[in-house]
Structures are given as structure tokens and as C-alpha cells.
Amino acid sequence: MHSTQDDKPLLKVQQLCIANETGQTLLDDLNFELYPAQTLAMVGESGSGKSISALALLGLLPETLSVNGKVELENIDLLKLSQPQLQQLRGKRIAMIFQEPMTALNPLHKVEKIVGESLVLQGLSEAEAQQKVISLLHDVGNEDAQQILKCYPHQLSGGQRQRVMIAMALALEPEILIADEPTTALDVMLQTQILDLLKKLQQQRNMAMILISHDLNLVKRYADQVLVLNQGKVEEQGTISEIFDQPKTEYTENLLNHNFGQALVLEPAETLLRLENVTVKYPIKHGLFNQVKHYKVAAEAIDLSLMQGEALGIVGESGSGKSSLALAIARLIASEGDIIFQGNDLNQLNQKQLRPLRSDFQIVFQDPLSSLNPRMTVEQIIGEGLKLRSISKALITTKIEEVLSKVELSIDSKYQYPHQLSGGQRQRVALARALVLQPKLIILDEPTSALDRSTQRAMIQLLRRLQQQDQISYIFISHDLQVIKALCQKIMVMHQAKVVEYQATALLFNQPQTEYTQQLITASQYGASCN
């Protein structure tokens, strides 16, 4: 809570309204006050107006959107400032952690420049800026800060990129930090570490925070006030106890419902996929001639088997090798060992031999905005794979509309581009693109990470239904053990590139064999203590 001496709001939002060029209201009559050291959480379903509200505060909305109302930062109306005036405030007084770091971080710059650029502009020498960057990277949980310093964004894991984003936002010590899904790609233990850090910095700097999150477990533990948005309107707002203990609307009650149901009970079936001693390693290059000096092992000696119609959950901390293993299974990166899919060793096939099998295994990536072509409409994105088949345009259109309905997107969304969709909607487009090819195996890398609880529940129900109807198998990579528990029959726990536990879901939750697994389970439980 804000202290009594801070009786004046740092930020005051009055009657904020946002509409698009056709006059459609995207945000209607938003009002709130934010005090120093206070955390205000914005929650709501995907597309409810959370992110556009935050972008409006920073003057980052497209010019095609009209904005009305008042946004006062200590009597300065931000909506009346020019772009040069706003640029003077961004980073120094108000900073933002964006939802999708892969698209927010400059791909041409190394981490050292990405985080340190603003520090150099403030007058620090390059050496001083480098030391500050290393300190910031350590603060947000990067033990190997010196190595990360020299990496480009694409060389980092999703969680590492998100931590770089947080370090960049904290560099100039802003008075207000807007955190749009700041821990989406992080494992549950690191989520707690990052938000504990942000809470500590709040107290030290008297920093206010707007926390945009679909994770109500984190909201309950770290926020002071909650604002619930529904289709651009405020459904209700109040203290943590008011919203969580006495919700006034059915919409809020549905958001708070964290029961995803149970995974299907399966009959024995044929083995679809088998991994034997699979290892993934990346070359580390140094020197004038960029020679390979050594290798970083991302996944070591992995064995697993997956039946037709079965779902395997893979969990572990950020950088543990989960995504690298997924890319290796899909033959998108090289690996050693045997990957046997439908009787074929994928590692022994060349690209021509592999092509006929590609539609049978699909992958849904962690960061949908960077995996969807920005120049293509949703219809073109989903239909791209179908065009390689000898089927009519009419049938392609029918299949696209069917799969949009399956993932609960409107038929009209097929005319939109990725940037016009919310994070959750983009994730459903990515799933639709995979489903339309009717694969036997779908590898899902954090597919529900950007979704609110009610949309997560709908997605899990959809995946279960497809699993039952079409005998689709899943490899489901996630840091959210509650989601994995609701879908997967088996769970593999990875830690520092190795498998530390691999067993049936019920057995793993009831009798975890390692302390690391127990820590993951404890941290994922709804309402768990943050200590």
C-alpha cells in the first residue's frame, strides 16, 4: 500500500477513452489513481483493453486510434504532450516492460547495447554503463551476466529475453513501471524472484507499478489494488481482498476460477514418438576467425516415448533446455541421437525425405508475434500450409473458418493482421495454423502463457477434445504446472539440460522424487506464499 505521506496520486487517469478509425470503442471511461510505491493490477480476458490502456499512458498507440480523457502525471497531462516531450519522460519517469520481448528487443544489437544505450545517453562512460548493465542483469536473475552481455536476442531463451527487457526498463530508475505480463515466459520460481525484486525496488525507490497480468496467483500476492476490464469497460475495481474474496460480477468469478479439470485417462496405444539419447548443443565461437572453441549443451541424453493420443508435459526453469528439445524433435535444429517418429528416424532423413512427414508434426511457438508473418492476414497465415495441397480455394476457406471456430476466434478475424490482434488472439492463430493441417503430433511451446485464466481453460478444453476425437498427441512445454496437470498424462522435469524426473502426472504430483520438482509444485499452487 502507499504510505500516508504520499497522499497525492503520482498518476491520475480520468475518463480515458480509445476508439479506432471506424468509431468502435476499444476502451470506455477508464478512471484510476496510482500512488508512489503502490501496485495496481489490471486483469481481464485477452482483448479486454489492458495493453492498449498501458500504451495510451506512454503515447505509444497508433495514430489511427483516437484517445480522449486525461492522463495526469503530477499535473502534466500526458495526452497533450508532443512526441519529443513524451520521449523525455519515457524511461526516466515512466518505463514499460513489453509483453513479447523478441519483438521489442533490437535483433541487430547485443544485450550490452540494448540495456546500456539509455545509460550512455545519460552521460555514463561505456565502462560505467557496462558495469551497470552487468549489475542489472544480476538483479533480474542472470547468473551468467558476462556471457549474456555479448549475446543477441535470438541467442537467448524466452525467459532470458524477458529478463533483459526488465533490466532495460529498470535502467533509468523510473517513478512508474508499467509491467505488461512481465513474467509470462518465466518458470514459477523465477516469477517469484522477479516480482520479489520489483517489490523490493518499489520500496527502495518509492516506485509505483501497473501490473498487467492474466496470472491471478501473482496478482493476489503482489498487487494492492485490482482493476478488472471486460471488453474495454471496467467491470469492477477494489482492493485485493474485495476482488478475490467478494467478487461482485460473474465475469470476475470466472476469471478467479482456477480449476482446469483433469487430464484424460487413456487406453494403451501404439508408440508415435520415441527419443533415444538425444543431445542438443550449440557451438560457442570466439576469436578473429569466429572459430568454434567449445559447445554449450542445451539438452543432454534425453529418452522419452509418446503414445498416439497421449500428452507429455515438459517443465523446468527458463533456459533448462525445454524449447531446444522441442526444436530438435521438429528437426528445426540439429541434434545427436535417435528421434523415431512413426517408425522413421528423423535424424537420418534429408530435407526432401522429411518434407512429406512435416504436416504430421507441427509446432506452436512461444512468441506468436515473431512467428506470424506481419504482412499476411490471419486467413493467409492459416491457409499457407493448405495451399501446398491439391485442394480447391473454397475448401481451403471452409477449413480456415472451421479451425477459427475451433480456437474460438470470430470468422471476421481472418481479415486482420497479427498486429491488430491481442497477445492471446495471436496465440490462438498460431494454434489454428498447426491444427488446420490435421497433424498427429503438436509440440506446444508455452501456448497458454499469454492467455487469461478463462481463455486458458477454454484452450485446455479444446486441446483435450481434439486429443479425444482425433487422437492427437501433444508435447506441451510450460512453466505452469496447473495447466500441465489438466492436460498431460506424463510429465518430464528438466533442470540444467538434464531430465531430473519423468513419470505419470498423478505420481509426480503426489510423490515427487526430487527437491527441485517439489519446489516447482509448491511455487505453482494457487495462493502459495511468496516467501
Regions found by a protein language model. Give the residues of each.
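ABC ATPase "signature
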Residues: 234-238, 246, 499-503
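A short, surface-exposed alpha-helical micro-motif characterized by mixed small hydrophobic
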Residues: 219-221, 484-486
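A short, proline-enriched helix->beta-strand linker immediately N-terminal to the Walker B motif
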Residues: 171-175, 436-440
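Conserved ABC transporter NBD signature motif
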Residues: 66-77, 337-345
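Conserved ABC ATPase "signature" region
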Residues: 128-147, 394-412
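Conserved ABC ATPase signature
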Residues: 151-156, 160, 417-421, 425
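ABC ATPase NBD coupling module
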Residues: 78-95, 121, 242-247, 288-293, ...
